């Protein structure tokens, strides 16, 4: 990718970061996302506290109550967080200090071009980072780079938009949505589970676990708006009911139809010796 394109991408996320900071009040959906991510890590990563961990963007840590890296940071000091936006990194560092978490290794870089040594990371967490690229080729480049940075027997836990969700629209509609200014940020391409598995295997990783998480419809903004509207209308009296509703929807992960209802696909992939 050319230097100008990299700059434009960083500028876009800087703008999103400034808006996100102003418009990101705590919400139940974000609380639910954090809980789900931590549960997924507990299931798929046997963390001892000494692992070298990489998280591939810092958007939640900068602005959202769905952040979970600070929770990991209180147990381990060997965490690297990256983001293409200096605005997002600066805000993530401010919030990290409020949680007494070391942010000295929060780096500004593109996930496709990591300033990391090969075979250096024990665990890589990539939650909905790679579905913000304009092409599947960009996703493949990023996956190749993550595989390079991961050590042998290291684990990659990755989530992406689920294109087989019954409410996932054709990408033409997504483009129109963005042109109308209805999307808060750039919505990129994604991969099916089969496509993701194939690329990971080409890069020397085997998918040991897969699932679908967050069983609610597209787009996220509509779900958040509905939640906030109900909370405001009921003056908080529906908060418990909303939490119970999200917990009930989580049960769909145990159904055979989970890939039709899950908002994201999630995989655990392990790197093996060449």
How should these model regions be labeled?
Residues 1-54, 157-179:
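Conserved class I S-adenosyl-L-methionine
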Residues 140-152:
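A short glycine-rich, Lys/Arg-flanked "PGG" loop and its adjoining helix->strand segment in the class I
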Residues 123-137:
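A short SAM/SAH-binding and catalytic strip from SAM-dependent methyltransferases
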Residues 54-113:
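Class I SAM-dependent methyltransferase SAM/SAH-binding core
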Residues 112-124:
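A short acidic, Gly/Pro-enriched loop at the edge of an enzyme's catalytic core
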Residues 209-274:
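A C-terminal cap/extension of S-adenosyl-L-methionine-dependent methyltransferases
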Residues 32, 179-195:
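Acceptor-substrate binding/catalytic loop of class I
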């Amino acid at each position: 990718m050319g230097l100008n394109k990299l700059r434009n991408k960083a500028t876009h996320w800087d703008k999103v970061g400034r808006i996100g900071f102003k418009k990101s009040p705590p919400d139940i959906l974000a609380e639910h996302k954090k809980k789900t991510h931590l549960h997924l890590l507990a299931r798929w990563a046997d963390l001892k506290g000494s692992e070298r961990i990489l998280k591939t963007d810092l958007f939640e840590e900068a602005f959202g109550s769905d952040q979970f890296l600070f929770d990991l940071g209180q147990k381990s000091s060997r965490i690297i967080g990256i983001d293409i936006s200096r605005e997002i990194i600066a805000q993530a560092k401010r919030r990290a200090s409020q949680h007494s978490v070391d942010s000295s290794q929060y780096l500004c870089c593109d996930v496709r071009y990591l300033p990391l040594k090969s075979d250096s990371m024990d665990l890589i967490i990539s939650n909905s980072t790679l579905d913000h690229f304009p092409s599947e080729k960009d996703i493949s480049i990023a996956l190749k780079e993550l595989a390079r940075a991961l050590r042998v027997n290291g684990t990659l836990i990755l989530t992406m938009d689920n294109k087989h969700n019954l409410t996932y629209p054709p990408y033409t509609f997504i483009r129109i949505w963005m042109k109308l200014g209805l999307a808060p940020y750039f919505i990129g391409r994604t991969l099916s589970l089969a496509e993701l598995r194939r690329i990971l295997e080409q890069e020397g990783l085997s998918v040991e676990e897969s699932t679908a998480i967050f069983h609610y419809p597209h787009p996220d903004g509509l779900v958040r708006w509905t939640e906030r509207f109900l909370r405001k209308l009921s003056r908080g009296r529906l908060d418990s009911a909303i939490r119970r509703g999200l917990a009930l929807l989580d049960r769909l992960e145990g159904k055979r139809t989970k890939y039709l209802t899950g908002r994201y696909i999630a995989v655990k992939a392990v790197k093996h010796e060449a």
